[in-house]
Amino acid sequence: MPDEIDQLREQIEAESIESAEEAEAFRIKYLGRNQGAIPDLFDQIGDLPPEERPEFGRRLNALKDRAQERIDEAKARLERQEQAGGPDIDLTLPGRCGFKGSTHPLTQTLDEILRILRGLGFSTHEGPEVETDWHNFTALNFPPDHPARDMQDTFFLEDPPEGTEPRVLRTHTSPGQIRIMEAQTPPIRVAVPGRVYRNEAISYKSFCLFHQVELLYVDENVTMAQLKQVLYSLARALFGEDVTLRFRPSYFPFTEPSAEVDVWWDDEDSDDGGQWMEILGCGMVHPNVFESVDVDPERYTGYAVGMGVERMAMLRHGIDDIRIFYENDVRFLDQF
């Protein structure tokens, strides 16, 4: 009789059930009280030796459960098929519109900046947000006592792995310069977008997290005039042909000479009718930076630019408070 269970299981699995009538016939054939195959085997348990009865009964109960599962599965399938063929749907009726999201204004501005830069011949490279002290400071000609290395200006990660140098949340995208020049030989023309972090006070025009785009161009005979031409081309494409720029001498450890660039921002509440908004720092790559990555400063020159995406988005859209970008206010985001 144990072999009969195996044979009956094969029959149950092979049986086709394609209608409610076939499901009822299947039930009667295998589970029917008077003539079902499985109840008939239950009646024969008493003919088995006592030691075989428990195992035979267990297997027979499992077979009974499987037969019932086949019936339940078939009924559920047939019900779904019946529902699918239910009342007709008028496809000409207007649909229900779900909530439509929008691209964040910072993402829009960043995408536009990178699109313009691609047209100017710059490729794109991304670097890590957690940087070593070497890439973030030392290789960029920051002296050991530079204020940027202090805890009040930089987020340092606690407990670096033993034998490794300190790690920080990058304070600028300039470490991308170092990583690219370590991996490539000139000529190099690249843009490095990314988030950066500063341990500084939050105000209407500064935040502890913001976005930058770094530009690096290294080749023979690169000049400051080429740098200014690229920045004018970028500003006009982004803000319009009538944009007003101002270059101011400045200081950065990794460029010499250095400059900051401001854009005139019309402001009706200002006594002067507007104000200058700083959007980027720039300059010619310092020879010490080239030497840190084994690039010959006697042969190559280059320029570097670090621009703030938030500031540019504020100028493009007339936004007067940087903090609103991070409030996730749908009323604000829906405008873009």
From Swiss-Prot:
> Biological process (GO) annotations?
phenylalanyl-tRNA aminoacylation
EC number(s) per entry: 6.1.1.20
Q: What protein name does the entry list?
A: Phenylalanine--tRNA ligase alpha subunit
Lineage, top-rank taxon, reads Bacteria
Q: Name one Pfam family in it.
A: tRNA-synt_2d
Q: Gene3D superfamilies from the entry?
A: Bira Bifunctional Protein, Domain 2
> Per the database entry, which stretches of residues form a coiled coil?
none
Q: What is the lineage of its organism?
A: Bacteria, Pseudomonadati, Rhodothermota, Rhodothermia, Rhodothermales
The record's annotation in PANTHER family points to: PHENYLALANINE--TRNA LIGASE, MITOCHONDRIAL, PHENYLALANYL-TRNA SYNTHETASE
User: Is the keyword Ligase assigned to this protein?
Assistant: yes
One GO location term (cellular component):
cytoplasm
- Which keywords belong to this entry? Aminoacyl-tRNA synthetase, ATP-binding, Cytoplasm, Ligase, Magnesium, Metal-binding, Nucleotide-binding, Protein biosynthesis
The annotation note on the cofactor reads: Binds 2 magnesium ions per tetramer.
- According to its UniProt record, which cofactors does this protein need? Mg(2+)
Which reaction is catalysed here?
tRNA(Phe) + L-phenylalanine + ATP = L-phenylalanyl-tRNA(Phe) + AMP + diphosphate + H(+)
* Oligomeric and partner information: Tetramer of two alpha and two beta subunits.
Single GO MF descriptor: tRNA binding
Question: Where in the cell?
Answer: Cytoplasm
Give the family per the record. Answer: Belongs to the class-II aminoacyl-tRNA synthetase family. Phe-tRNA synthetase alpha subunit type 1 subfamily.
In terms of CDD domains, this protein maps to:
PheRS_alpha_core
User: Which residues are involved in binding Mg(2+)?
Assistant: E256
Nucleotide-binding listed as a keyword: yes
